[in-house]
Amino acid sequence: MIAATPMPLLKQPDRLEARLRELPAEPGVYFMRDASDRILYIGKSKKLRSRVRSYFRDLERLNPRINLMVRQVCEIEIIVTDTEAEALALEANLIKQHQPHFNVLLKDDKKYPYLCITWSDDYPRIFITRKRRLGNSRDRYYGPYVDTRLLRHTLFLVKRLFPLRQRPQPLFKDRTCLNYDIGRCPGVCQSLIRPDDYRKTLQKVAMIFQGRSSELVELLEAQMLQAAENLEFEKAAKIRDQIRGLEGLGAEQKVQLPDDRISRDAIALAMDEQHACIQLFQIRAGKLVGRLGFVADAQSGSAAAIAQRVLEEHYASVDSVEIPQEVLVQHDLPEAELLEVWLSERRGRKVEILSPQRQIKADLIAMVERNAEYELARTQQSAERHTASLIDLADLLDLPELPRRIEGYDISHIQGSDAVASQVVFIDGLPAKQHYRRYKIRNPEVRAGHSDDFASLAEVLHRRFRKFAEAKARGESLAPSEQRQGSLLRPDDLADFPDLVMIDGGKGQLSAVVEVLRNLNLLEDVKLCSLAKKREEIFLPGASDPLPTDAEQPGVQLLRRLRDEAHRFAVSFHRQKRTERMRRSRLDDIPGLGHKRQKELLAHFRSIDYLRLATPEQIAEVPGIGAVLAQQIWGYFHPSETA
């Protein structure tokens, strides 16, 4: 018997009221779950009953994002704690573990890079990335940094002060490269340094990005004196050069405070109706050592609430040694005392949160706020350009509304071999890579020597829109108005219905897609166009001639960016599949013949050609190959003689 799908609590008033009455008036953490038992949101409260009830009391006063979340809640779970500070610590850990969608305040903004140290590797790498992956919890990310140039320059100098791994992969299999010869790498590729010793070097480097350069200088000075006492003068000279380099690196910082004994962070933000741009300055030993930048949804709360949440997310992701003695804030935080207690417990020493009104600290906050306003202005200008592109495209294609979600499709193959397709998604004019999809073409007629782009596109569009056709047949709305905003939030339901679909190709490719959508009874629902490469011509369904366009108009340029991205994504997937096929041995197709036995066979016979000429008895002489498997191998190369 199939279990019934749970209904949202808002549609079950009696059950909702009973569940709310069960909640204790004690501190703790609460979980909001949907019909699929996924965690939508994790929160904390001093009084669980009051906080959870507040979500369901008046939905209209909630911001649109939380309103959407509450309408999906089917179950509420709690964990009771002794204190509110314990609840805050538990909430931070649970959010980090589960990453609930509606807890993600900060947008995935690629313009601010991170510095990553892969502690999960035996010999960790250090590199700059614009994507904060969560693949291994042991890897450490610092940032996001506002000044990309300064970050690259700092890493450049660090790699010359300390002997570090310079390459993702070794250049040679059996010898070191030039970096080892000139002293920039300790010979990681040939294991010329023990992993523990290499990690000690990298731990010193990490101190620089933790804002602990002064502490590192003191450590190196002690090591230099010890080396000199031991008559290790060459080692002492190297450490001396490292100290001088670190002092020179610190001298480049422009902002200084007279009090160099206290570590402090200063946070401020600027916001409009849509965007909140947050800047966090890290002051250590009286100098500005780091500028971090964040972008959040302005509708997620007040300026003070957003600042509080940013600080909670930021400090939950850093090591305890990176938490400063003081945190200067632009606005009084709604739960400043609670945050102070939590940070003090994590740091092991007292942390103060201050909202300065005058003198040097107030001037520092004002400077951070000016930088936040500058980033907001840049964000607004970028958003205006993208909006202008969407308006122009809607006018060009005569769309009923702005195409906030656009999907682009392309096919990639070489004469039918390794045929694949790509689906890329632009939301509000920008790539939304979390929604990208890749397809392997399953059509048996599409194979090496037999290509068919029309059939491939037809297959992919059928697979993509089949769920919408089934929903329409059941009488469901493809994009409910109350979920329209959710199309950006929930890619796994019917709310991801596109406003526009673009096909990379001309009239032929577009006609193949039109036929598929007609068969699915979706032709009237899906807005379609195609963009041909040769003359950058735009075609619409049923039109024999391309639209008259100007190649420089914003809407056309947006389609070209979408087309180029779909092409890039398809080609990269095709190359991946082709490389995998080329790396596969012909012996992979023989059942029971694993990688180890394949190596034994090739080592014995030197090549597959010689193996093909061998008798079953000769094959059976190879270690690990019995008579039965030898007969199977011989039969694979001589199918006509075994038939």
UniProtKB/Swiss-Prot annotation:
Gene Ontology CC annotation, any one: excinuclease repair complex
Q: Which Pfam families match?
A: GIY-YIG (PF01541), HHH_2 (PF12826), UVR (PF02151), UvrC_RNaseH (PF22920), UvrC_RNaseH_dom (PF08459)
Q: Which residues form the UVR domain?
A: 214-249
Please give the InterPro entries that the UniProt record associates with this protein. Answer: DisA/LigA_HHH, GIY-YIG_endonuc, GIY-YIG_endonuc_sf, GIY-YIG_UvrC_Cho, RuvA_2-like, UVR_dom, UVR_dom_sf, UvrABC_protein_C
The source's domain of life comes to Bacteria
Q: Fetch the SUPFAM superfamilies from UniProt.
A: C-terminal UvrC-binding domain of UvrB, GIY-YIG endonuclease, RuvA domain 2-like
Protein name per its UniProtKB record? UvrABC system protein C
Gene expressing this chain = uvrC
